[in-house]
Structures are given as C-alpha cells and as structure tokens.
Amino acid sequence: MPMSQPAAPPVLTVRYEGSERTFAAGHDVVVGRDLRADVRVAHPLISRAHLLLRFDQGRWVAIDNGSLNGLYLNNRRVPVVDIYDAQRVHIGNPDGPALDFEVGRHRGSAGRPPQTTSIRLPNLSAGAWPTDGPPQTGTLGSGQLQQLPPATTRIPAAPPSGPQPRYPTGGQQLWPPSGPQRAPQIYRPPTAAPPPAGARGGTEAGNLATSMMKILRPGRLTGELPPGAVRIGRANDNDIVIPEVLASRHHATLVPTPGGTEIRDNRSINGTFVNGARVDAALLHDGDVVTIGNIDLVFADGTLARREENLLETRVGGLDVRGVTWTIDGDKTLLDGISLTARPGMLTAVIGPSGAGKSTLARLVAGYTHPTDGTVTFEGHNVHAEYASLRSRIGMVPQDDVVHGQLTVKHALMYAAELRLPPDTTKDDRTQVVARVLEELEMSKHIDTRVDKLSGGQRKRASVALELLTGPSLLILDEPTSGLDPALDRQVMTMLRQLADAGRVVLVVTHSLTYLDVCDQVLLLAPGGKTAFCGPPTQIGPVMGTTNWADIFSTVADDPDAAKARYLARTGPTPPPPPVEQPAELGDPAHTSLFRQFSTIARRQLRLIVSDRGYFVFLALLPFIMGALSMSVPGDVGFGFPNPMGDAPNEPGQILVLLNVGAVFMGTALTIRDLIGERAIFRREQAVGLSTTAYLIAKVCVYTVLAVVQSAIVTVIVLVGKGGPTQGAVALSKPDLELFVDVAVTCVASAMLGLALSAIAKSNEQIMPLLVVAVMSQLVFSGGMIPVTGRVPLDQMSWVTPARWGFAASAATVDLIKLVPGPLTPKDSHWHHTASAWWFDMAMLVALSVIYVGFVRWKIRLKAC
C-alpha cells in the first residue's frame, strides 16, 4: 500500500480594494506602504512595513510589525491575529484599510519575497546545460528581515518580544537582505509549478511600476542557441527573467566562447550596456557591469549577479554631487563648487533667491548639461560619462504640466506608456503599469477624469505619473508648486514625501517655503550658485540665526561670497573636486519603431481633436461657413461666361478668390495652435525617446486628412450652388475633381504653413496675430483680388505663399483668362488652361509644403546639450 504524502501547506489569498494576491507558505509576506511590499497599501496611516503574514505551526498568522497605527480585529487593536478563511482585519485604525483573507482554496501561482542565488555560467568545454539543483540561499545581513523569529517558532498570543523587523531607512534595500561584505547576488525564488494560464494575471509578483528586479525560475532554452547559452529578458521563458518594464521580452544572450563569456544584445529597444557603453556584443571580464533597463548586473568569476546597492563604490544607490561648478562664456559662473549627497528615501529641497541657479543645478543633475568641474554620480555611475545607460533611471518633471488637458488621465498615461515602454509589452502590461502608478500617487479614482478638470495638485501628480511609468529611482521636479494655493502646495509636498519614502531619491526645486519640514535636507543657494546652507530643515534657524525667510534670502543675496564663506567655516573646507570625466555622447534616446510611434501619435492626435469639443465644433462648421460665403457672390453663371456689362462681370474670379481664401484660412487655422500648445509635452517626450520624424509625420498625415475632408465639403457646396467648371479639365479626367484637388492641395499646404507658424510662436498669445497676418497677406498675394504679376516685390514675395499657387491652379482649371478677358484678368502664364501650367502650380504647392515641413523638422529637432 503506497504511503500517503503529507498535505501541502495551504496558500493564503489576500484581497485589498479589488486586488488579489496569493502566497505560498514558507516565506513572510510583507504588507505596507512601501513599493516593495508584497501587498502594498497606499494609505497615510500605514507604515512602510506594517504587517507580516506567516505560516507557523500549521496556521497562518498576521503579526503587527511594530507599526505606528496598529492592527485591528473587531474594533480592538491586537498584536497578532490567527487567520482563518473569510476573515477580515483592519490596519491603521478600526475603520482603516480592510484586508480579506482566503485560506487554502486558490489555485493560482503564489507570490513571495524572493530568495537570493547566483547564476554561474556553464563552462564551454562541458558542452551541455548544467543539471538543475536546489537554489543557493544567500546569508542574511544585519538590520534586515532576519530579526524576525524563524517560521518554525510558535507565535505567542502577546506581541512578539524583541525587536521586530522593519524596512531599513535610508539607502538600504528591502530585499535581498545583504551585508556589506557579501558577494553580489541575483534574485530567484524557489522553483514552483507554473500556474494555469487563466490564473497568471491576478498573482503577478513583480511591481512593474517601480522596476523591482526578481530573477525567476530557469526555463528551458528554445530556438537555436549555442550550447550553454543563457537568455536574459522579461519573458518567463528566459533563463534569467527580469520583470523590468524597460527590458525587452528577450533582451540579451550570454554565450560562452573560446575567448570568454560574451553578451549579445538581441536588438532590444532600450539596449544593453557594459560599463555604461551601449553594445551589440562584448566579451565580459571580471568586474564588468552589465546594465539592462534600470538594473545593474556584475560579472565576476564566471557568475552574473546583481550589483549590491550597499557596496562602497555604489554609494548605496544614492546621488552624489561633488564640487560641481558650471561656467559659461568663459568667466560667468552659474554654479560654484556645489556638493550634495542624497540617499534613497531622501527628499531634498533646493531653494534660494532668483538667480541662484536652482533650475540650472536640476538640469545638470538630470544630465542635460555637464559641469565644468566636479562630478555627479548616481547609483555608482557617473551621470555625464555614462548618461546613455542612466537616462531611464532619471525622471525630470518640468515646471509646465506635461499632460494633455483634453485627455483623461487614463488615456494620457496609456499613450505615454506606448511611447516609453518596449514595443513587446502588451496592452495588459501597460494597463497594469498605469494602474500601479496611479495607485501609488493616490489618483486611481481620477483615472477617467479629464486632466483639465483636475486641481492644480492633481495635474502635477499626473505629470509625475508619466515619469513613474519607467520606474526611475531619481526624480527631479522643477517648481512643482508654482502657482498653487497653500492647500495644494501641501498636497504636492506630501506626495513628494511619499515618493521618497518608497525608496527613491527625490530632488525638488521650489520657491515655496511653507512645508520644507517634510524634507530630509535643504540646499540653500545664493546668487551665483554658491552654497549658503545644506542640512536638515530643523537646523536652518540655529545656523542662519533666524527662521524668517525674507531675512535669510536678503542676507545671502546681498553678499553671496560671505554666505558661502560662513557655510565653509561651519562644515570645513570641501575636498578638491574629482577630475572631470570626458562627457560621453548623450546617445539617442531609446525609442520604438517609427511606425509604432507614428501610430500612437496619430491616434492620440485624433483623440485630442475630438476631445476638444469647442475646437472640434469650430473645425466641423468652418467648411460650411466658407462654402456659404462663396455662395454670396452675385451672379448666376458660376464658372460660365459672365456678362461683361452685367452686375457680376468677374463672377468666376470672385468665386475662386473666396474658395482660395477659404482653403488658406481652414488649413492655417487647423494647425497654427498645435505645436505651441504642446511644446513642453513634446520636449519631454522627445527627451525620453519620441522620434521627431515620427511625431511630425503623424501630425502631417492627420491634418492632411482633415484638410482634405474640409476641402471636399467646401467644394461640394460651391459645385452644388454655382455649378462646376465649364471649360473641361486640363490634367485630370473630370473638371469637378480637378477643382477639388486645387482646393485640397491649397488647404494642405496652408496647414503645413500653420505648423511652421506654430513652431515659430513663443507663446499662445502670439497665435491670433500670426493667423491674421497670414490670412490677410495671402489674400493680397493670391493675385485674384489685387494683381501681383510683374509687380516688384509683390510678385517675388507671393512665390512663397500657398495662396499664389492655389489660385493659379484653380484659375487654370476653370480657364479664368478665357472666361474673364480684358483688364479684369492679369496676363499670368501660370493661369493658362494647359496641363503644363497646372502641373507647375501643383508642384509649387507640394514644394512649399515640403519646405514648410522641413523647416518645422529643423525647428523642433532634438538639440544636443
């Protein structure tokens, strides 16, 4: 009789606000506000590691992890709760966030904190894949989760004695637990059976929004790969799986060769970097740092392992600004020997009077400009020498909102996710990332709200959400509270505090001084970029002698050199700045294919037009209005021969003038406000990978279609009301079709002119004057109302306007010279009723369109810093 197998421990399913996670026994489950928690509860009453769930002595228990606001059962605060099926507990207060438990019935995959192990690359001479064995478990370092009693210890009814586990403060990472002397390790949970296909979605263990790195169980090699090759990527069929939003599904391959281990990039979108340089293939040597997305892996002794954030050379993953000086024009110093250290979890405010270089420092730290002296390092990398590999780790939120106001929060973030995430991410992946980002920012309830209907603080959160899509670990904000009232100011600063508490380095440039107490440190700059103070906000009063900011700013502004001297006297002389490394090429931002970007921008542009109801109604009515105006021309012959002695001797010419001016006005009005209206948005998207070419082509195509539709409406109205051309077509088969082409191409060329004017404009206030000048000048240069042929310089100036060639093409189509002979019609060779004249007019319209688009492409190009 076969022996019965012991029953497997029951799994635990945790439900919170509609989300569901399932965990297997054997590992503590962390519930808290921290982004790295297994069950994240984004609530101000919840501690970073609030609650521990553990399977012990045949049952699941919930343990209060020394939280400030406690664990509640039946309205009573308790230290420990025995969990049973269908039980509910509250955390934070008796009416706080509710957790519902289900024990033993869920069949999906089980999430858990990962264990640690190294992956040793197989020896090429072996020629075979190594046999699977039990994963090696890394040792626990001090100050980490090992302080909790082991899982085999019975949980007492009273609060557990001794120190309880907490997430480390500062720069320590939640997992893997590590000590300063331990070799770098790679994360991999124990092998588990794959879940059913239908159960995968609800139990995903990784937090894509914060780019937590977990290496999952090894899979089998597929495809034709050399013996011993190791595949790296986001998909579960890789040997090393990185659930990192910037990693491609099959990102890179490690291949043993006679010369050593080689890493080969699999044409990934965001690239593979070795020691900060992007490579297609490279031989690895001990100590080489391989960067994939936001993850650093170290190659040592034939082993690929994650780089430890707490090693000395990596500066605990923080930001180090050392002796940074920036001088322009040879002798004008904007930043003067600034030094600053910010660890993960720290919120740093940069303040100072106008002209102190606050925004300049932010741009320099973000890598947009490089220092004259000194260095900026982040997570062990020189920002300016290795910028290409760090670009995705740095999120920059400019002062202007970078979210389209006409879109809902969901649509804005989904389009941004399409542009920023690798092309092999599915819609479900992007939806999950967006949902988690909004949850972190407490914006989930506003997901279907139009951005322009949000409050100022909520709009700033939406701008921050765009940056969090790719999981940056350094977030820089320039004047996020500008123009906000005190209540919204507090909301924004509280949000920044929470973002820092999640383990990021947050640097905020601000003029608002009311809520600096939420910051960990304050950097006060004097004019000329000189440091006047750097330290906790509680020390400002004792050090500066007053807490009156007006007096402080006045003092440092009156004598910046003295302010810096007093600072150095307090802190001691700063060490000499390290030598400046040669700035590397910025490299092209990682971007998806042109077609994918084109598709995304085109779909977004259409939604923007339709969502702006007032603008959309105006565009829809405009062709009907212009068509009706054309009907106001007196006479009843249309494009026939008018009576020279009648009331309308130039009826055909007047109809063409109104058609031509209507086409010019429709096209220019269609696009003139487009580029200036989203310039800040485009600049940020361009910096993170949006192709200027794809962006411009998408807009050209969308507006071309709209211009053609508008032209069709106008032309049909005129043809119905006045009749079609009577002299036959000169180039196309039908004169009515040819007249439509005349109007449509003129409208399209005018739309391209509108884009050019929008690229030139400095502000939205300049749009209306530019539109008026453009339309009125082309009314003159068309030649239909005021003769320009042979008149210097009107004739020459008219050659660069669409109206000149649009009117000439339509005049050639209807044979205006024949219909209205004599002094009313100038002898213009471009109006002749011949195919050569018509094709020349069309060619000029197309050429002008290309010139306008080329100018716009040059104007909005990505400029090197």
From Swiss-Prot:
User: Does Transcription show up as a keyword for this record?
Assistant: no
Instruction: Give me the segments passing through the membrane.
Output: 614-634, 652-672, 700-720, 740-760, 767-787, 836-856
User: Known post-translational modifications?
Assistant: Phosphorylated by PknF. Can probably be phosphorylated in vivo by other kinases when PknF is missing.
Q: What happens when the gene is disrupted?
A: Disruption results in a growth defect in macrophage and mouse infections.
How does it associate, per the subunit comment?
Homodimer. Interacts with PknF.
Q: Which GO terms describe its cellular component?
A: cytosol; membrane; peptidoglycan-based cell wall; plasma membrane
Task: Show where the FHA domain sits.
Answer: 29-78, 230-279
Q: What is this protein called?
A: ABC transporter ATP-binding/permease protein Rv1747
Which UniProt keyword terms apply here?
ATP-binding, Cell membrane, Membrane, Nucleotide-binding, Phosphoprotein, Repeat, Translocase, Transmembrane, Transmembrane helix, Transport
